[in-house]
């Protein structure tokens, strides 16, 4: 932000302009006039401010050299004051003579120009001289302290106008940045809510899949129970059929061989005992099947070891059945004739076929259960791995986003710190330059004030003319500021500026 320049009239000093006197009159001068002009320049030389370019150059006249070679007289303060007054009077006298001579020459030249028509070259030269004089006059006016002060005020007014525009632009940029930050925060919140919704949807889907899997599993258990009941009914029907067949054989045997009643009775008793034993085995089988169902339900949640035990148990039952069947067959062979043997053989083969079919179904069912359990275990393992992978991915994304926001904030803080340090450095440098300028201006103003006091009444008339000129310049510069669009509050200081004579 530009700092407000001092309002105490401080300004940078520039080298004074010197105008070629030949621009104001004829080009020919007498030798005496040239000598007087040189003498006038010698007397006025102490009052001229040396420009920075001329500080290393010293011009000595013959009189100065002679004076420097002479012995330095010891002068009192009164002698110094008297010498200054004498030199001042002589200088004023020479200036008056030179001015009168210049006015006379200008008047003669004007009369001569009026009598003789100007040539084209003279017209061009006059235009060039007028432009040069106008430029020189403008430069001389611009070197005046009040005009420099006005220029400083104009520069300050333009600077603060630009500063206000920059401040307004900065406010707008900050507002846009805040709006953009709010938009980014809203987008991040929306993304976070979407991620949560997706996670909840996946959780709901997972729960639904588990529920469906449990329902399918329950339905399979029910289906197996129905299949077991159906198989049990089939086995009961087969047993009833076998009993009927045995009864038929017994009746035929009683009709055909009355003499074998005792043997038949014994056979019936043996069959009854066998039936009783088979009923007991059936009840035991039911108990074992119930236990087997419980083991299957528990096996769904545990391992495959129980299936092997179940297979061994079934194998043992099958062997017992085969042994019992062989025993019955031996008994029937002893009690029946050839036809009975054939019928018994057919019944035994039928029973063995049914037993083999039952064992194959049991084995296929066990294999299906094992395959289903393996698939469930694989699905559960894959689901857990997917869930862990998803959590790891979400954690990685959150960490990346956090590090990105942290890097952006650090970069922004570093930029703001650099801007603050640069601004402080510029302000400090500007302050030092301004203080040096103020001090230099203060010293220069003291010197100029001393010079103004020495000039006294002789310069009052010129000061009044200059005041009027400065007022015109002030009005012109106010018009320039108004045309440049500078607000009235920044033109007020220049408007209030008082032009003192």
UniProtKB/Swiss-Prot annotation:
GO cellular component: motile cilium
Keywords: Cell projection, Cilium, Coiled coil, Flagellum
Annotated family: Belongs to the CFAP45 family.
Pfam families: TPH
PANTHER family assigned to the protein according to its UniProt record, in alphabetical order: CILIA- AND FLAGELLA-ASSOCIATED PROTEIN 45 (PTHR15504:SF0), NASOPHARYNGEAL EPITHELIUM SPECIFIC PROTEIN 1 (PTHR15504)
Highest rank taxon of the organism: Eukaryota
Family annotation (InterPro entries): CFAP45, TPH_dom
Main localization category: other
Location of the protein in the cell: Cell projection, Cilium, Flagellum
Record protein name field: Cilia- and flagella-associated protein 45
Coiled-coil intervals: 75-114
């Amino acid at each position: 932000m530009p700092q407000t320049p001092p309002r105490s009239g401080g300004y940078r000093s520039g080298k004074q302009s010197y105008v070629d006197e030949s621009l104001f009159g004829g080009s020919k001068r007498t030798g005496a006039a040239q000598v007087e002009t040189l003498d006038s320049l010698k007397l006025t030389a102490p009052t001229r401010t040396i420009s920075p370019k001329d500080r290393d150059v010293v011009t000595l006249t013959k009189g100065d050299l002679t004076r420097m070679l002479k012995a330095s007289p010891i002068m009192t303060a009164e002698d110094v004051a008297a010498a200054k007054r004498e030199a001042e009077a002589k200088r004023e006298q020479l200036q008056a003579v030179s001015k009168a001579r210049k006015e006379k020459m200008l008047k003669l030249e004007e009369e001569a120009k009026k009598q003789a028509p100007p040539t084209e070259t003279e017209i061009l030269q006059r235009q060039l001289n007028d432009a040069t004089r106008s430029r020189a006059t403008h430069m001389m006016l611009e070197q005046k302290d009040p005009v420099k002060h006005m220029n400083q005020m104009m520069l300050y007014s333009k600077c603060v106008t630009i500063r206000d525009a920059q401040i307004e632009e900065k406010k707008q940029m900050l507002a846009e940045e805040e709006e953009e930050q709010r938009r980014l925060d809203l987008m991040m919140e929306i993304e976070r809510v979407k991620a949560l919704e997706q996670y909840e949807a996946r959780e709901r889907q997972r729960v639904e899949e588990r529920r469906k899997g449990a329902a399918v599993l329950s339905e399979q258990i029910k289906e197996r129970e129905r299949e077991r009941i159906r198989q049990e009914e089939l086995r009961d029907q087969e047993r009833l059929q076998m009993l009927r067949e045995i009864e038929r054989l017994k009746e035929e045997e009683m009709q055909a061989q009355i003499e074998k009643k005792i043997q038949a009775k014994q056979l019936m008793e043996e069959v009854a005992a066998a039936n009783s034993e088979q009923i007991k085995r059936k009840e035991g089988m039911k108990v074992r099947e119930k236990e087997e169902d419980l083991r299957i339900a528990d096996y769904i949640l545990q391992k495959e070891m129980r299936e092997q035990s179940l297979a061994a148990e079934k194998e043992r039952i099958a062997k017992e059945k085969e042994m019992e069947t062989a025993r019955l067959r031996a008994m029937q062979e002893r009690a029946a004739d050839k036809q009975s043997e054939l019928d018994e053989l057919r019944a035994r083969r039928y029973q063995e076929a049914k037993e083999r079919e039952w064992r194959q179904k049991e084995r296929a069912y066990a294999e299906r259960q094992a395959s289903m359990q393996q698939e469930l275990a694989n699905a559960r393992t894959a689901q857990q791995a997917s869930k862990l992978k998803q959590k790891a991915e979400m954690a990685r994304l959150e960490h990346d986003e956090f590090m990105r926001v942290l890097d952006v904030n650090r970069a922004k803080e570093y930029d703001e710190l650099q801007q603050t340090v640069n601004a402080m450095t510029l302000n400090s440098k500007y302050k030092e330059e301004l203080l040096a300028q103020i001090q230099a201006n203060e010293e220069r103003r003291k010197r100029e004030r001393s010079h103004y006091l020495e000039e006294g009444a002789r310069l009052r008339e010129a000061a009044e003319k200059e005041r009027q000129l400065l007022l015109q310049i002030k009005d012109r510069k106010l018009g320039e500021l108004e045309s440049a669009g500078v607000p009235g509050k920044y033109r007020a200081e220049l408007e209030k500026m008082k032009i003192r004579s």
